């Protein structure tokens, strides 16, 4: 008799954004003459940088020639991309990372979800609440115990330490969904906690390109001794518009040495390399050439232009809602604006109000966890015209609601 992984019973039947898509599609079917504007799922709208497109075209042409054809990529990524990452994201910023600590992937979601493969099932997991659903769901799928760390206006969305000592801690900063960032002192507190308690921090830095304030670290490795306690995840999705291309990378320092139940010391770097060689066949050559071009002089100028475009959208949403007396958070160091729902509406009531009355989509906060109840997330990834129109519609609605 076949047995299933019954931990799947403990998670929601549908992924948050799949549920939203289902509701929106149903609305569109019944209201085909209505123009719906999405400020919901964090998918990009601006074209891939020309430097990246040119590199992808060139790599595609290489694949058409027997002499330059590339097959399976190295499990950890091609050296040309690893060296570009190393120089631009770390060495030039004074951060010491070695090439064999970088693992190229097909997007941060894969590795944040799969990192649990090398971690024991009996680890006590601490996750901020609200949080990117993947952190919670993947650990529930594995049957691990989870302690949620509420992030609310009362603690300025900066979590307190767990009640029970955490073995593994998920931190995403700048944060999805709240848009809040940790300064260096706040992040150091967590590194010190991990050092004291022999914990592992899983640090999701997918939105570091949107940091605008000087005292906000772009990498956890800016904090002294963080390489002893932290794995960092990076993404090209929001930095360079790779949501449809799929590329990112993970840093697993060689200083991360964990003791087994029998007292043997094992390297997480070696374990992750072994895991990847078994379950991952590498990111496509064409995509990695595109990612390499992100670090070219022209590529950097072009992606910065797109990032500034999205930052402008964030400011439009934030200022527009605040002009109505709506309380907002984030939007300064991240492409997300976290909103207190007006008039004591629940998150889903506000979702339905916006969809049915003005055809604007956002994301209900309680889809990110219990602490998200009564909140709502807007993203800055729409195009400028749609963002302005959505804010105008919300102003007309909320002024009289």
UniProtKB/Swiss-Prot annotation:
Gene3D superfamilies: Aspartate Aminotransferase, domain 1 (3.90.1150.10), Type I PLP-dependent aspartate aminotransferase-like (Major domain) (3.40.640.10). Substrate binds at residues 15, 42, 109, 132, 176, 281, 377. Pyridoxal 5'-phosphate binds at residues 72, 108-109, 132, 176, 207, 235-237, 246, 281. It holds the Pfam family Aminotran_1_2. It catalyses: (2S,6S)-2,6-diaminopimelate + 2-oxoglutarate = (S)-2,3,4,5-tetrahydrodipicolinate + L-glutamate + H2O + H(+). Pathway: Amino-acid biosynthesis; L-lysine biosynthesis via DAP pathway; LL-2,6-diaminopimelate from (S)-tetrahydrodipicolinate (aminotransferase route): step 1/1. GO terms for biological process: lysine biosynthetic process via diaminopimelate, diaminopimelate-aminotransferase pathway. Its cofactor is pyridoxal 5'-phosphate. PROSITE patterns: AA_TRANSFER_CLASS_1 (PS00105). The keyword Transferase applies. The keyword Transferase applies. Keywords: Aminotransferase, Pyridoxal phosphate, Transferase. It is an enzyme of class 2 (transferase). Its EC number is 2.6.1.83. GO terms for molecular function: L,L-diaminopimelate aminotransferase activity; pyridoxal phosphate binding. The modification N6-(pyridoxal phosphate)lysine is found at residue 238. Disulfide bonds: none annotated. Involved in the synthesis of meso-diaminopimelate (m-DAP or DL-DAP), required for both lysine and peptidoglycan biosynthesis. Catalyzes the direct conversion of tetrahydrodipicolinate to LL-diaminopimelate. Belongs to the class-I pyridoxal-phosphate-dependent aminotransferase family. LL-diaminopimelate aminotransferase subfamily. Homodimer. This is LL-diaminopimelate aminotransferase. It comes from Azobacteroides pseudotrichonymphae genomovar. CFP2. The gene is dapL.
